[in-house]
């Protein structure tokens, strides 16, 4: 048989179609080098093994069978049943084999599960002829660029059951993408025809195979997933898109109770605490249908609306020691209007001043206290005059105590603190000439030392005030409460030396104070 020139990219091993030579002794065939000629070691070994007895060689067959089989297939191709295409096609191939939609060439053997390619030669020989004819027709396709097949969403398993049964009958016509061409056992067709088809070895393909499809050679990652058809969208979901927006009720800050407010006034008026905390009622359109919650509500009998309990007040560990009436007063008050120990609100009406962290009172409030207006609520009313002694002697508020040094104030107030009794308060008011520097600084110092000497939030003097405008403004408005009824400024020409002396003393004491604080911090380390 005369063959044309083979293309350079295809490597094939060709043998001359000559009559089979006479058999030689086994020892010479096995070890002789003259037989090998110019063949490669692998080819020599293949020819030698085929000529051995007991391995299905040609010598076991009659002479006429050997002559006819040598024209169709050489012995060297018997070990190539896996599809490596080392032989040329035979002349007896029929045209009907072209219609076979074989899509994989370099693939696994057909009988991989349960058998060996060497033991199934009769069936593989017929397949090799089909493979060789397809190679000759489509040998230029190997030069084309290989592209992986794009994954396609698999259809439902139930929709392809009938199609899978048809495909399983003929494994070569419509083979699955993810399975090789020779992956199934010999009884595959019997199983599929009997109806006991199992998808274990034949995964379902998302799309029916065709002759033009290119097999990717990889396992389809989308196979084996139990995907169901999209269920019909419930009507409650459509209401989320079509229903109007539901606005939550805005919370009014004016009606909301404070941090320490009690629920009694809120519940008596319009139950503001319940309105601020209670969830908004869900509409019937928002609630999904067919849920477990709906099931339980239908099974249980309908009950009358039970009024929701009022909001429990926030409890604080610092308020456990106070009586019930005091705690109620705390809840009624705004947290910003509570005194230092958070036990009650401020007694006096405060005004804005230079320092936002301090509470200021007007000269009129000071005069009303001196007139005894709050005598039933106040046990002790202490006025600390923070001016220098020459200023205090020039005129001061009746009953005021002149303490211009921090150590003097600490010894007067904190060494022997004044204890309130009978529910009455102890109030301390600080002032200087303008109540801009010395008075506010002294007020902060007393609060700081009081905090250090007590467990938070307890204080000896929880209610501290600063007189707005100082002694100068009070003298102009309430001169009758001044003693003597005069006013001496700090920068008086007759007391320049006294001013220098007191300032130096104050600065020295301030420097010593900073040193003492530094020493105390070092001791703590």
From Swiss-Prot:
Residues 262-274 have a biased composition (Low complexity). SUPFAM superfamilies: Rhodanese/Cell cycle control phosphatase. A motif (KEN box) lies at residues 141-143. The modification Phosphothreonine is found at residue 508. GO terms for molecular function: phosphoprotein phosphatase activity; protein kinase binding; protein tyrosine phosphatase activity; protein-folding chaperone binding. Keywords: Cell cycle, Cell division, Hydrolase, Mitosis, Phosphoprotein, Protein phosphatase, Ubl conjugation. The active site is at 432. Residues 1-42, 260-318 are annotated as: Disordered. Residues 377-483 form the Rhodanese domain. Interacts with CCNB1/cyclin B1. Interacts with YWHAE/14-3-3 epsilon when phosphorylated. Interacts with CUL1 specifically when CUL1 is neddylated and active. Interacts with BTRC/BTRCP1 and FBXW11/BTRCP2. Interactions with CUL1, BTRC and FBXW11 are enhanced upon DNA damage. Interacts with CHEK2; mediates CDC25A phosphorylation and degradation in response to infrared-induced DNA damages. Interacts with HSP90AB1; prevents heat shock-mediated CDC25A degradation and contributes to cell cycle progression. Belongs to the MPI phosphatase family. Tyrosine protein phosphatase which functions as a dosage-dependent inducer of mitotic progression. Directly dephosphorylates CDK1 and stimulates its kinase activity. Also dephosphorylates CDK2 in complex with cyclin-E, in vitro. This is M-phase inducer phosphatase 1. It comes from Rattus norvegicus. The gene is Cdc25a.
């Amino acid at each position: 048989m005369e063959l044309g020139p083979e293309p350079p990219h295809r490597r094939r091993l060709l043998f001359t179609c000559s009559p089979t030579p006479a058999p030689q002794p086994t020892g010479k065939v096995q070890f002789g080098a003259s037989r090998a000629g110019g063949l490669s070691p692998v080819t020599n070994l293949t020819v030698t093994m085929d000529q051995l007895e007991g391995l299905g060689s040609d010598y076991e067959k009659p002479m006429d069978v050997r002559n006819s089989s040598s024209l169709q297939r050489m012995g060297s191709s018997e070990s190539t049943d896996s599809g490596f295409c080392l032989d040329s096609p035979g002349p007896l191939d029929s045209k009907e084999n072209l219609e076979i939609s074989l899509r994989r060439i370099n693939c696994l053997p057909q009988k991989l599960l349960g058998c060996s390619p060497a033991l199934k030669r009769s069936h593989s020989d017929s397949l090799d002829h089909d493979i060789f004819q397809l190679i000759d027709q489509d040998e230029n396709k190997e030069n084309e660029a290989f592209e992986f097949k794009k994954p396609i969403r698999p259809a439902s398993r139930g929709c392809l059951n009938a199609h899978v049964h048809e495909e399983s009958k003929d494994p070569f016509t419509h083979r699955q993408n993810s399975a090789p061409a020779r992956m199934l056992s010999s009884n595959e067709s019997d199983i599929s025809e009997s109806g006991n088809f199992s998808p274990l070895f034949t995964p379902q393909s998302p799309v029916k195979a065709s002759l033009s499809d290119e097999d990717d050679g990889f396992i389809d990652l989308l196979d084996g997933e139990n995907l169901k058809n999209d269920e019909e969208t419930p009507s409650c979901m459509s209401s989320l898109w079509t229903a109007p927006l539901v606005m939550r009720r805005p919370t009014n800050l004016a009606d909301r109770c404070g941090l320490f407010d009690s629920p009694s006034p809120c519940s008596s008026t319009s139950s503001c605490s319940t309105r601020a905390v209670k969830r908004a009622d869900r509409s019937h359109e928002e609630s999904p249908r067919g849920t477990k919650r709906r099931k339980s509500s239908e099974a249980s009998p309908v009950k009358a609306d039970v009024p929701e309990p009022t909001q429990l007040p926030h409890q604080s560990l610092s308020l456990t020691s106070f009586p019930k009436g005091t705690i109620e007063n705390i809840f009624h008050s705004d947290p910003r209007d509570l005194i230092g120990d958070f036990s009650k609100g401020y007694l006096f009406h405060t005004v804005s001043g230079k320092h936002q962290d301090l509470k200021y009172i007007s000269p009129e409030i000071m005069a009303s206290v001196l007139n005894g207006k709050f005598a039933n609520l106040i046990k002790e009313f202490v006025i600390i005059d923070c001016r220098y002694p020459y200023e205090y002697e020039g005129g001061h508020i009746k009953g005021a105590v002149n303490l211009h040094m921090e150590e003097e104030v600490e010894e007067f107030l904190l060494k022997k603190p004044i204890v309130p009794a009978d529910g009455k308060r102890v109030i301390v008011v600080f002032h200087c000439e303008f109540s801009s520097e010395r008075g506010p600084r002294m007020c902060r110092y007393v609060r700081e030392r009081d905090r250090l000497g007590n467990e938070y939030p307890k204080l000896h003097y929880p209610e501290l005030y600063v007189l707005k405008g100082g002694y100068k403004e009070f003298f102009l408005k309430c001169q009758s409460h001044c003693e003597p009824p005069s006013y001496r400024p700090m920068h008086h020409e007759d007391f320049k030396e006294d001013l220098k002396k007191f300032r130096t003393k104050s600065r020295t004491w301030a420097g010593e104070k900073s040193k003492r604080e530094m020493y105390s911090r070092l001791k703590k380390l």
